[in-house]
Amino acid sequence: KEPGFSVSIALVAKDGTPNIGVVFDPITDTLYHAAKGIGAFKNNNPWKIKPANEHLTYVTDRKLKDTPHAAEIESLLHQQVKKLGLKGITEMAGGGSVLNGIRVLENGPACMLKLPKKEDGGGSLWDFAATACIFQELGLPATNFAGRRLDLNRKDGTFMNQEGVFYAN
């Protein structure tokens, strides 16, 4: 058991819509799940998200300073801080894409983003399918970098690098 590790499973429709998403954090023994049209749950209780921080939490797998295009990302984050009237940015680095999606939900206002890139990587569709369903049921964005629905049933591969990823709370 390593912090940031999780187990997830999802059911995705042929059109790429996430219909069921389940995430388990073995470190905290916490279960998150959602089903399309039914809602989102944390440890089997209906889950309501209430962003309470005075800062924007940037959730990432590696520190911003070690990220390609760090200046571009930092600029985007500062724009959001200003737009939302927040006091600054707090970085939460480490962990896999699945739990980082959950961290966005639990540390709002928060975001996780992966810029589009040409080379493979940036997580695979199975890294995002379960949390995309949970976000969908909470009415929060889990989109590609252009703001469109994630393509979770790609025919040309599993990596999400071509469209990027954006999660927000």
Locations of regions flagged by a protein language model:
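Residue-level detection of beta-strand-connecting loop/turn positions
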Residues: 43-44, 147
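Short hydrophobic/aromatic-rich beta-strand segments that constitute the beta-sheet cores
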Residues: 40-43, 60
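Short capping micro-motif at the N-terminus of alpha-helices
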Residues: 21, 34, 49-50, 152
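DPxDG-like acidic metal-binding loop motif
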Residues: 1-41
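An extended, acidic
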Residues: 50-169
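Short, flexible active-site-adjacent loop segments at beta-strand->alpha-helix junctions, enriched
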Residues: 37-38, 46, 64
